[in-house]
Curated annotation (Swiss-Prot):
Amino acid composition bias (Low complexity), ranges on this chain: 142-156
Gene Ontology annotations for the cellular component aspect, listed alphabetically: cytoplasm; nucleus
Any one Gene Ontology BP term: cell migration
UniProt KW keywords: Cytoplasm, Developmental protein, Differentiation, DNA-binding, Metal-binding, Neurogenesis, Nucleus, Receptor, Transcription, Transcription regulation, Zinc, Zinc-finger
UniProt name for this protein: Nuclear receptor subfamily 6 group A member 1
DNA-binding region positions on the chain: 11-86
Domain NR LBD: from-to ranges: 204-435
Example GO molecular function: DNA-binding transcription factor activity
Keyword Lipid metabolism: no
Compartment(s) of residence: Cytoplasm; Nucleus
Annotated family: Belongs to the nuclear hormone receptor family. NR6 subfamily.
Subunit: Homodimer.
């Protein structure tokens, strides 16, 4: 006898993005990508934002561009968050359940995070020692469980689920120093639980970070960026310089991939797929950190010698304006955080290891590696900055912004890039001078 599920699976199209469906997931027919995205979003209690009008197109090629609209459509189409296991492990609670209908009000509560906060507060009051969080992918979206210490707990720290997870992804058992609270925003809700005692860095974290630091090319960029005083740079000259600079930065990312400690763990096909999708993001991250002195110094001096025409100013697009504003925001965020080299290399690895990218064959392996460096970054920030409990979430929340900017850059006409970088670098250099 045919079932409702059999009839729907025959359609073979994901109800969220239209990609090839693999079955009934959390109540509706969907693909593996949307299934995993929904699970991570709910398990990690993520709150997204849409930069447009909350009706972005959802397709196989565009689904990663707006996490807000993707999750919104998951809920609107009937994905059942209660079908997800609380521990975040594979295997839903009820595979035969169909789609659920929830009110617009409840959807809004979920999208705003209000529902998660209320559930977390209830769980905290009922059982303050329970581990309610499960780490997800750091890279396509922000990964934000909230590790803090609970001095008042009478139970052993080893009862907390983080111990086994930490050992699983770092590979080396270590002493427990903290526990998870239910959601990211618990930091401000429970200020008395923030750890103040110093602790040591996990030896495995130290090793993995050093491997990433070794893979990074910190030599100054070789692209000439010095212009004699009084020389007027033309649009075509500046564009050519930006192209040469992008070529060198891209070459360095290709070399970086070959030096990664997990290079032998993935296929060349997967590396090609990951790099071809994330190279702009990697260049942006490295420009904000490793090569920031040259980018915001030498290159900014070159762009200052370029004077756009009235026509160029008039034709500057809305996409270009949005990218410029977001780049300035991201620059100020990195400057405010003073991102260390150790944090940068972890963020770069997390961003690169994005299992949601279409075409990857070893999805689970990429996700495992992603989680490993997610924990390494968390371990390091809590060790190095014990009095900055929001630092790790702040770092992780920069990654979706990096992705969004990189995605928007492709929509900016090439002839507008000289003006975009002139305006961006001028604003950043001005803010540095004021500091």
């Amino acid at each position: 006898m045919d079932t409702w599920e059999d009839d729907r699976v025959d359609q073979r199209a994901c109800l969220i993005c239209g990609d090839r469906a693999t079955g009934l997931h959390y109540g509706i027919i969907s693909c593996e990508g949307c299934k995993g995205f929904f699970k991570r979003s709910i398990c990690n209690k993520r709150v997204y934002r849409c930069s447009r009008d909350k009706n972005c197109v959802m397709s196989r090629k565009q689904r990663n561009r707006c996490q807000y609209c993707r999750l919104l459509k998951c809920l609107q189409m009937g994905m059942n968050r209660k079908a997800i296991r609380e521990d975040g492990m594979p295997g839903g609670r009820n595979k035969s359940i169909g789609p659920v209908q929830i009110s617009d009000e409840e959807i809004e509560r979920i999208m705003s995070g209000q529902e998660f906060e209320e559930e977390a507060n209830t769980s905290w009051s009922n059982n303050g020692d329970s581990d309610h969080s499960s780490p997800g992918n750091g890279v396509s979206e922000s990964n934000q469980p909230s590790p803090v210490s609970t001095p008042s707990s009478s139970r052993s720290m080893e009862l907390n689920g983080f111990g086994s997870l930490r050992d699983q992804y770092l590979g080396t058992p270590g002493p427990m120093h903290y526990q998870y609270l239910p959601h990211l925003f618990s930091y401000s809700a429970h200020p008395t639980l923030i750890p103040t005692q110093s602790r040591s860095l996990d030896p495995q974290s130290h090793t993995l970070i050093n491997q990433l630091l070794t893979a990074e090319d910190i030599e100054p960029l070789s692209t000439p960026m010095l212009i004699e005083d009084g020389y007027k740079v033309t649009q075509s000259e500046l564009f050519a310089l930006l192209c040469r600079l992008a070529d060198e930065l891209l070459f360095r990312q290709i070399t970086w991939v070959k030096k990664l400690p997990f290079f032998c763990d993935l296929s060349i096909k997967d590396y090609t797929c990951l790099l071809s999708t994330t190279w702009q993001e990697l260049i942006l991250l490295s420009s904000l950190t490793t090569y920031s002195k040259q980018i915001f110094g030498d290159l900014a001096d070159v762009t200052s010698k370029y004077s756009p025409s009235e026509d160029e100013l008039h034709r500057f697009s809305e996409d270009g304006m949005e990218v410029m504003e977001r780049l300035i925001y991201l620059f100020r965020k990195f400057s405010q955080l003073k991102v260390s080299n150790e944090e940068y290399v972890c963020m770069k690895a997390i961003n690169f290891l994005n299992q949601d990218i279409q075409g990857i064959s070893s999805v689970s392996q990429v996700e495992q590696l992603n989680k490993r460096y997610w924990y390494v970054c968390q371990d390091f920030t809590e060790y190095r900055y014990p009095h900055q409990p929001n630092r790790f979430p702040d770092l992780m929340m920069c990654l979706p912004e990096v992705r969004y900017i990189a995605g928007k850059l492709v929509n900016v006409p090439l002839e507008q890039l000289p003006l975009l970088f002139k305006a961006f670098l001028h604003s950043c250099k001005t803010s540095l001078t004021k500091e």
